[in-house]
């Protein structure tokens, strides 16, 4: 900023060494902008910013006669030395920037610069003292001096790199960073809270370091203006009320965090802010009348003053016990021993999770199933989303039973209102109840060796503490205490554990083999197969590519839909897609989104088209049944050029006989020129080497013993010999009562073996051995007689469906699949297959 004059001085009194006053000039036409920016500057930097006036105010001799605006105005900054310097650089970016840059970023990162109530953007400005604004989603504008702008741009580019690479922290650091980041974001909760929690862990760590490192080293100065004091008090009140306002997301996570551990002690930069409990309760979600009739069961110590007392006993090391008894049958799940230190057992955490989601109105069976599948260490938000999905599915499948169960869970039954032991007359009976609670939990932690006598005695003691009116209404049910102590291991957990083993895709830079066919990999099929049909595992694609590369293939193409590049928690290790695309191996099939609906081309068609052009092999476990009638060439590809696979963990495996036990071996199947396995043929064609099983048929006649190459005549369109059938032909035909001209399928592959009651081996007087038999079967024509003898009619393509038929099929499919998320898929299938009328086939495509 070009200054007309710069004046620096220090304050007087005790703050003389700490407070600095800097006066400088700015362009006169920026006066209104600076006055509007005054609150923003003072909020970003601990300084007192004042617009003093124009230079003409202090130099009356320089007043202009034409009444024009003054060229320069005086500005004053008062505060710590470092804070004043940074604020001055920031004002320089507002008034007279030396450098202006625009930086684009992925739209998914907009939550960083607009979320957390603008906290991260403010920290970025304080750290780099550049004027950083967000003119539009996906674009950042940076103005100021050269050094501040370069620093800000470098910091933003680092964020973008971590986001695009989806970098994760080491396993021992990631949980602590996630907890600290979640605590910080919830203190600045807004509509971007969920998006911020889904960021990569390395980016979360970088944002936390930005927020924690941005601490001005200068001491705070005392502001002399009473207006500034009032403004700071108002801002503080607004901030307190804002932090006290709980949202459904913060309600869920804060209650769990308050029981599990106190994360705030680990992060000095994240300070707790006091708030009123009544303010927080005033903004909770509205509950129904049925919910108000029953008392809630919170499992957080912060709500104890409202829902129940915390009783401490000096004999048990001041371990707090929450008395939450709503039903005698739920006694074991309601009374939870919360230890004061951090070593909370997994069994206690499991009970806390189950009971917490039960109080939200969800069925216990659904809650236990979801926690068992995902694990109790999963993020609460993901658990809540999955529980909501499972509840909707059960509601659709069993509407009558589930609705009754949900109504009971939400408190709409006719049971009497349960009372919490708060009143003084009940305290005498509550004391032995607490003793029994501790004994109950102590035996529960001991394991499954508890005797039934102890359980019954404990339940009898507990029953005596319950009021008489509740005893007659509710009958407790006997349940094992350790029913859910050990959640079952799931395939999802095994897959997630396998991802912890590091894998790198390294392809050797060496020439391959030229006689190998083009390999076309169905990326979606391979990725979902490796991800156990639950995750889109990009590692599976990399393993398949590495397998074929090591076998010498260099013509490899992988097809993956374009929308798989979007961030999704169910798509793992997306960096493999980027690596394969850079190598020219991966190709994305087109897809786009219009008004929230995805429009994607069928990637299977790209596989078949490329296989038709290159003569390649398609690696997939799909059978492509919907494309069999499209063209004869595609039908041949589907029959003869599909290569199936399997995964054994991270090991990609292929069968030795891709087309069956009588088909070619894997090396022959992948080679352009199959290896000649006969003794008399030097370079046979592929048709001579192998005929698919559907084409197997015996030769209609064999040549006589005195000649192998007799001329053939045509009769009824089939090849017939001129000589009569010889004894060799009689031996070749089975004698089981079937057609004489029908031979077993392995007649072209194996010599005849002696069987009781069937054909006998070839007589020695014929002078034919095994090699002569193969030479005898080999024709002199380009194709074997078996292929000529089979009538292969061209498939008849049915007429295209009429609009009315399409509407009928769509209505029928919607009745079968009433879920709303299936409608778009049904429309895609009907538009992609305009000739198909089979409702069963269409239903199978929807299920795929």
Swiss-Prot record:
<dbReference type="InterPro" id="IPR056631">
    <property type="entry name" value="UBA_N4BP1"/>
</dbReference>
<dbReference type="GO" id="GO:0045088">
    <property type="term" value="P:regulation of innate immune response"/>
</dbReference>
<dbReference type="GO" id="GO:0005634">
    <property type="term" value="C:nucleus"/>
</dbReference>
<dbReference type="InterPro" id="IPR056578">
    <property type="entry name" value="UBA_N4BP1_C"/>
</dbReference>
<feature type="compositionally biased region" description="Polar residues">
    <location>
        <begin position="1"/>
        <end position="18"/>
    </location>
</feature>
<keyword id="KW-0694">RNA-binding</keyword>
<dbReference type="GO" id="GO:0001818">
    <property type="term" value="P:negative regulation of cytokine production"/>
</dbReference>
<keyword id="KW-0539">Nucleus</keyword>
<dbReference type="InterPro" id="IPR036612">
    <property type="entry name" value="KH_dom_type_1_sf"/>
</dbReference>
<dbReference type="GO" id="GO:0043130">
    <property type="term" value="F:ubiquitin binding"/>
</dbReference>
<dbReference type="GO" id="GO:0016605">
    <property type="term" value="C:PML body"/>
</dbReference>
<keyword id="KW-0540">Nuclease</keyword>
<dbReference type="Pfam" id="PF23054">
    <property type="entry name" value="UBA_N4BP1_C"/>
</dbReference>
<dbReference type="GO" id="GO:0004540">
    <property type="term" value="F:RNA nuclease activity"/>
</dbReference>
<comment type="function">
    <text>Potent suppressor of cytokine production that acts as a regulator of innate immune signaling and inflammation. Acts as a key negative regulator of select cytokine and chemokine responses elicited by TRIF-independent Toll-like receptors (TLRs), thereby limiting inflammatory cytokine responses to minor insults. Has ribonuclease activity.</text>
</comment>
<feature type="domain" description="RNase NYN">
    <location>
        <begin position="516"/>
        <end position="668"/>
    </location>
</feature>
<dbReference type="Pfam" id="PF23052">
    <property type="entry name" value="KH_N4BP1_2nd"/>
</dbReference>
<dbReference type="Pfam" id="PF23050">
    <property type="entry name" value="KH_N4BP1_1st"/>
</dbReference>
<dbReference type="GO" id="GO:0031397">
    <property type="term" value="P:negative regulation of protein ubiquitination"/>
</dbReference>
<dbReference type="GO" id="GO:0005730">
    <property type="term" value="C:nucleolus"/>
</dbReference>
<feature type="region of interest" description="CoCUN">
    <location>
        <begin position="801"/>
        <end position="848"/>
    </location>
</feature>
<dbReference type="InterPro" id="IPR056630">
    <property type="entry name" value="KH_N4BP1_2nd"/>
</dbReference>
<feature type="domain" description="KH-like">
    <location>
        <begin position="81"/>
        <end position="165"/>
    </location>
</feature>
<protein>
    <recommendedName>
        <fullName>NEDD4-binding protein 1</fullName>
        <ecNumber>3.1.-.-</ecNumber>
    </recommendedName>
</protein>
<keyword id="KW-0391">Immunity</keyword>
<dbReference type="GO" id="GO:0032435">
    <property type="term" value="P:negative regulation of proteasomal ubiquitin-dependent protein catabolic process"/>
</dbReference>
<dbReference type="GO" id="GO:0005829">
    <property type="term" value="C:cytosol"/>
</dbReference>
<dbReference type="GO" id="GO:0003729">
    <property type="term" value="F:mRNA binding"/>
</dbReference>
<comment type="similarity">
    <text>Belongs to the N4BP1 family.</text>
</comment>
<dbReference type="Pfam" id="PF23053">
    <property type="entry name" value="UBA_N4BP1"/>
</dbReference>
<feature type="compositionally biased region" description="Basic and acidic residues">
    <location>
        <begin position="220"/>
        <end position="241"/>
    </location>
</feature>
<dbReference type="Pfam" id="PF11977">
    <property type="entry name" value="RNase_Zc3h12a"/>
</dbReference>
<feature type="region of interest" description="Disordered">
    <location>
        <begin position="220"/>
        <end position="249"/>
    </location>
</feature>
<keyword id="KW-0399">Innate immunity</keyword>
<feature type="region of interest" description="Disordered">
    <location>
        <begin position="1"/>
        <end position="21"/>
    </location>
</feature>
<dbReference type="InterPro" id="IPR051101">
    <property type="entry name" value="ZC3H12/N4BP1_RNase_Reg"/>
</dbReference>
<dbReference type="InterPro" id="IPR056629">
    <property type="entry name" value="KH_N4BP1_1st"/>
</dbReference>
<keyword id="KW-0963">Cytoplasm</keyword>
<dbReference type="InterPro" id="IPR021869">
    <property type="entry name" value="RNase_Zc3h12_NYN"/>
</dbReference>
<dbReference type="GO" id="GO:0045087">
    <property type="term" value="P:innate immune response"/>
</dbReference>
<dbReference type="GO" id="GO:0045071">
    <property type="term" value="P:negative regulation of viral genome replication"/>
</dbReference>
<keyword id="KW-0378">Hydrolase</keyword>
């Amino acid at each position: 900023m070009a200054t007309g004059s710069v004046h620096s001085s220090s304050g007087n009194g005790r703050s003389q060494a700490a407070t600095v006053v800097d006066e400088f000039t700015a362009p006169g036409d920026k006066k209104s902008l600076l006055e509007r920016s005054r609150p923003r500057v003072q909020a970003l930097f601990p300084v007192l910013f004042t617009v003093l006036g124009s230079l003409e105010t202090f130099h009356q001799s320089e007043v202009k006669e034409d009444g024009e605006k003054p060229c320069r105005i005086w500005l004053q900054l008062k505060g710590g030395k470092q804070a004043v310097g940074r604020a001055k650089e920031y004002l320089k970016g507002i008034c007279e920037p030396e450098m202006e840059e625009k930086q684009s970023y992925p739209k998914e990162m907009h939550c960083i610069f607009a979320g957390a109530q603008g906290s991260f953007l403010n920290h970025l400005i304080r750290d780099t003292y550049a004027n950083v604004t967000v003119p539009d989603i996906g674009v950042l504008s940076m103005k100021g001096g050269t050094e501040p702008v370069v620093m800000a741009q470098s910091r933003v580019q680092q964020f973008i790199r971590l986001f695009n690479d989806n970098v994760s922290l080491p396993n021992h650091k990631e949980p602590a960073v996630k907890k600290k980041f979640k605590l910080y974001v919830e203190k600045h909760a807004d509509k971007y809270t969920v998006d911020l929690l889904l960021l990569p862990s390395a980016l979360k760590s970088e944002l936390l370091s930005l927020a924690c490192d941005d601490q001005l080293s200068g001491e705070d100065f005392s502001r002399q203006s009473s207006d500034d004091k009032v403004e700071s008090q108002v801002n503080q009140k607004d901030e307190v009320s804002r932090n006290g306002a709980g949202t459904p997301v913060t309600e869920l996570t804060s209650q769990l965090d308050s029981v599990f551990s106190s994360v705030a002690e680990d992060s000095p930069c994240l300070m707790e802010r006091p708030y009123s409990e009544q303010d927080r309760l005033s903004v909770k979600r509205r509950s129904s009348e049925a919910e108000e009739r029953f008392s809630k069961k919170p499992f957080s110590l912060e709500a104890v003053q409202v829902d129940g007392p915390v009783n401490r006993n000096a004999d048990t090391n001041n371990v707090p016990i929450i008395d939450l008894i709503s039903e005698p049958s739920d006694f074991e799940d309601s009374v939870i021993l919360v230890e004061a230190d951090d070593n909370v057992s997994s069994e206690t955490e499991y009970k806390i999770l189950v009971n917490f989601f039960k109080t939200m109105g969800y069925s216990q069976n659904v809650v236990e199933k979801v926690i068992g599948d995902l694990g109790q260490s999963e993020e609460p938000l993901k658990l809540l989303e999955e529980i909501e999905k499972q509840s909707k599915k059960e509601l659709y499948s069993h509407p009558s039973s589930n609705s009754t169960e949900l109504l009971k869970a939400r408190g709409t039954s006719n049971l009497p209102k349960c009372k919490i032991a708060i009143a003084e007359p009940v305290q005498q009976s509550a004391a032995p109840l607490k003793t029994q609670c501790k004994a109950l939990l102590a035996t529960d932690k001991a394991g499954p060796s508890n005797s039934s006598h102890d359980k019954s005695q404990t339940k009898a003691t507990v029953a005596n503490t319950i009021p008489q009116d509740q005893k007659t209404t509710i009958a407790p049910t006997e349940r094992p205490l350790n029913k859910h102590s050990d959640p079952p291991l799931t395939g999802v957990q095994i897959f997630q554990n396998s991802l912890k083993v590091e894998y790198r895709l390294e392809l050797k830079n060496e020439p391959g083999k030229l006689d190998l066919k083009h390999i076309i990999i169905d990326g979606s099929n391979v990725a979902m197969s490796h991800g156990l049909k639950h995750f889109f595992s990009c590692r599976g694609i990399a393993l398949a590519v590495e397998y074929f590369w090591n076998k010498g293939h260099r013509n490899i193409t992988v097809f993956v839909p374009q929308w798989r590049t979007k961030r999704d928690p169910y798509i793992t290790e997306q960096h493999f897609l980027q690596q394969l695309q850079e190598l020219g191996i991966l190709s994305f099939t087109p897809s786009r989104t219009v008004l929230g609906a995805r429009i994607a081309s069928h990637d299977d068609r790209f596989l078949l088209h490329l296989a038709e052009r290159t003569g390649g092999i398609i690696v997939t476990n799909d059978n492509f049944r919907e494309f069999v009638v499209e063209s004869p060439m595609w039908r041949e590809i589907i029959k003869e050029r599909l290569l199936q696979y399997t995964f054994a963990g991270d090991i990609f495996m292929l069968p030795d006989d891709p087309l069956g036990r009588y088909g070619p071996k894997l090396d022959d199947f992948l080679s352009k020129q199959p290896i000649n396995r006969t003794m008399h043929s030097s370079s046979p064609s592929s048709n001579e080497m192998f005929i698919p099983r559907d084409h197997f048929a015996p030769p209609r006649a064999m040549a006589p013993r005195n000649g192998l190459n007799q001329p053939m005549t045509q009769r009824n369109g089939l090849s017939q010999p001129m000589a009569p059938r010889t004894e060799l032909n009689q031996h070749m035909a089975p004698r089981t009562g079937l057609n004489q001209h029908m031979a077993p399928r392995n007649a072209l592959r194996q010599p005849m073996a002696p069987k009781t009651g069937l054909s006998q081996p070839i007589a020695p007087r014929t002078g034919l051995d095994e090699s002569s038999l193969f030479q005898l079967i080999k024709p002199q024509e380009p194709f074997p007689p078996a292929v000529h003898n089979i009538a292969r009619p061209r498939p008849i393509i049915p007429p295209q469906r009429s609009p009315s038929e399409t509407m009928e099929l769509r209505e029928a499919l919607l009745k079968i699949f009433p879920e709303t998320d299936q409608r778009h898929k049904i429309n895609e299938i009907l538009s992609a297959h305009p000739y198909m009328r089979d409702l069963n086939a269409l239903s199978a495509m929807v299920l795929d």
